[in-house]
């Protein structure tokens, strides 16, 4: 008896094991099914050309969307002029939620295997040349909400199984050759259309062949009333939600997973799993095997490469080379999480990422005009120079980006390497703050943290350099130096100035010229005098307020934004001048006591602790 029980247990285990195997859909099987569909549809060589049969994971293919577990959830192949048939192998995609193949010339019948797509919520095969009967297996799709089979050549009766779809909201079967009686319960669906068939909409309880919602007649007044009512209702609901969230945040503060964007921005909360997962091979091909000719820069965690995806989208691929070292992998996870929730028009958006056993990569949009540093100092002869209006817009855009990081993210985000090289420029020369590799999430209860000093000499705030303590005021200092770069076109630290004067640091250089009222010697010669003197003076004043020695004296970024917009600068500048006179007298007194000399600095190079971006 005991032996018999063991045999039954073994058999049950074996059956369970094989059942699990059968229910598991591997990326290989998904890719094979999709590629079989491509063949059956008779796709041309230039259509779906990135669908590679040898690629394990189809989640990188065009028109395919996957979830965070690499299961295919959406396939959209609309208006591509296919002339083939549907493949029954699509039926293995049991996680597929949306299947759209409308507007093609697909022939043949709808496969019975489509009834295996049990996760499907939307099936759209409108405007094709499909023939045969509607499969009764469609009734297995209990989650189906939208079924659109309009404008085909389907015949036969409407299967009774469609009455067993509890979530169906839209049923559009018009313009076919269907015949017979329409099941009574289908008239209870909110939106239906059975017109242009040989169907019987009468019977014992006559019904219109099209629902009021689906009717396309000229009753514009009722439609207008409905639309107005819906819009008004939605407006009231949205206002109530916003009011609720505002009151909730006033009492409880920000939650970790919620951020408040500035006016005019769309709240786009992006979960980690919703970022695009790139295949290693895809990025390898995009960057020409990470060719040195495609290197855009090198940072503290690796190089950045220019890449081109199969759809000709240009990207910047950041390849992390030290993720196995302490902090490397954690830095990757921190950056992915941080960038994905910090969404603002003046912040660099993360497109996606790639992880393998040996690689960690981040993918960003490619900025057409590269960086502010490049446009200021590395343009070729004949290239357009940044005019003054563009420079003002860049200054304000970058300030708004840093304001968002400091004051609208919870916890706040400290960049810690603010400089012109990390302010990127899009196709419209709008400022886009990039490189969060050095960014640090700071607990709201702390104003600073002691950590390893990272940054670029000439941009690092004095308290950060001497103590390792950083805060948002550290970024404000770096931003002030960046403003001086924007005005002068010069580097933050330049030893060539030793030939003429002692001021190696751009900050000291500008302070000296400002005291001497030599504005023309400060402004970038490339502007060729095309600027407004008062506006340049205002920008220099903001820069000097941002670079005060004591972090407590520096404005926060929201104040910087207001000052750049013309509010509150005069009062702050007057206070600064009074303090600066006292500091200058003290400095001159100390200078008379000590011989500073030049030899200790003359042969040094600029030190970039984090590397170029």
From Swiss-Prot:
GO function terms (MF aspect): ATP binding; identical protein binding; protein serine kinase activity; protein serine/threonine kinase activity
Reaction catalysis annotation: L-seryl-[protein] + ATP = O-phospho-L-seryl-[protein] + ADP + H(+); L-threonyl-[protein] + ATP = O-phospho-L-threonyl-[protein] + ADP + H(+)
SUPFAM superfamilies given in the database record: L domain-like, Protein kinase-like (PK-like)
GO cellular component: plasma membrane
Signal peptide segment: 1-31
Modified residues (Phosphotyrosine): 464
Annotated TM spans: 226-246
Primary site of residence: membrane
EC number: 2.7.11.1
Protein name per its UniProtKB record: Probable LRR receptor-like serine/threonine-protein kinase At5g10290
Organism placement in taxonomy: Eukaryota, Viridiplantae, Streptophyta, Embryophyta, Tracheophyta
């Amino acid at each position: 008896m005991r032996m018999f029980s063991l045999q039954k247990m073994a058999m049950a285990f074996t059956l369970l094991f094989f059942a699990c195997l059968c229910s598991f859909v591997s990326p290989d099987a998904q890719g094979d099914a999709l590629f079989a569909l491509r063949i059956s549809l008779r796709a041309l060589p230039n259509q779906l050309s990135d669908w590679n049969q040898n690629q394990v994971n189809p989640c990188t293919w065009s028109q395919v969307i996957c979830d965070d577990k690499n299961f295919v959830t959406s396939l959209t192949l609309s208006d591509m002029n296919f002339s083939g048939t549907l493949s029954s192998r699509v039926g293995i995609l049991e996680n597929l939620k949306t299947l759209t193949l409308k507007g093609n010339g697909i022939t043949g019948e709808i496969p019975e295997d489509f009834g295996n797509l049990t996760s499907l919520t939307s099936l759209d095969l409108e405007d094709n040349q499909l023939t045969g009967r509607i499969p009764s297996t469609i009734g297995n799709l209990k989650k189906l909400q939208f079924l659109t089979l309009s404008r085909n050549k389907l015949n036969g009766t409407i299967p009774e199984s469609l009455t067993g779809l509890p979530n169906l909201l839209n049923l559009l079967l018009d313009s076919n050759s269907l015949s017979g009686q329409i099941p009574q319960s289908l008239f209870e669906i909110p939106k239906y259309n059975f017109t242009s068939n040989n169907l019987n909409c009468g019977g014992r309880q006559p019904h219109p062949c099209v629902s009021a919602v689906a009717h396309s007649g000229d009753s514009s007044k009722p439609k207008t009333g409905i639309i107005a009512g819906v819009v008004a209702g939605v407006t009231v609901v949205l206002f109530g939600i916003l009011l609720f969230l505002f009151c909730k945040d006033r009492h409880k503060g920000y939650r970790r997973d919620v951020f408040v964007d500035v006016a005019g921005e769309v709240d786009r909360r992006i979960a980690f799993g919703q970022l695009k997962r790139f295949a290693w091979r895809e990025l390898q091909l995009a960057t020409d095997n990470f060719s040195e000719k495609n290197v855009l820069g090198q940072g503290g965690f690796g190089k950045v490469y220019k890449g081109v995806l199969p759809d000709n989208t240009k990207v910047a691929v950041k390849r992390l080379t030290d993720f196995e070292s302490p902090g490397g992998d954690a830095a990757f996870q921190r950056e992915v999480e941080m960038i994905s929730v910090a969404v603002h028009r003046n912040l660099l958006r993360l497109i996606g990422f790639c992880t393998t056993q040996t690689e960690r990569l981040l993918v960003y949009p490619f900025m057409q005009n590269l960086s502010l540093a490049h446009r200021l100092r590395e343009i070729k002869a004949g290239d357009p120079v940044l005019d003054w209006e563009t420079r003002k817009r860049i200054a304000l855009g970058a300030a708004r980006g840093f304001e968002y990081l400091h004051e609208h993210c919870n916890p706040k985000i400290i960049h810690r390497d603010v400089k012109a090289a990390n302010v990127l420029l899009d196709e419209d020369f709008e400022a886009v703050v990039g490189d969060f590799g050095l960014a640090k999430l700071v607990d709201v209860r702390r104003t600073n943290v002691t950590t390893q000093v990272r940054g670029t000499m000439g941009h690092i705030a004095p308290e950060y350099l001497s103590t390792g303590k950083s805060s948002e005021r550290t970024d404000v200092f770096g931003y002030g130096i960046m403003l001086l770069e924007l005005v002068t076109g010069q580097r933050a630290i330049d030893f060539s100035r030793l030939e003429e004067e002692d001021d190696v640091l751009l900050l000291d250089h500008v302070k000296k010229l400002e005291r001497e009222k030599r504005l023309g010697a400060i402004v970038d010669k490339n502007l060729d005098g095309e600027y407004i003197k008062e506006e340049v003076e205002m920008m220099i004043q903001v820069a000097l307020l941002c670079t005060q020695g004591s972090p407590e004296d520096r404005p926060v970024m929201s104040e910087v934004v207001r000052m750049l917009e013309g509010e509150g600068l005069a009062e702050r500048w007057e206070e600064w001048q009074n303090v600066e006179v006292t500091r200058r007298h003290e400095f001159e007194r100390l200078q008379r006591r000590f011989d500073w000399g030049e030899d200790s600095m003359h042969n040094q190079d600029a030190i970039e602790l984090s590397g170029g971006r």
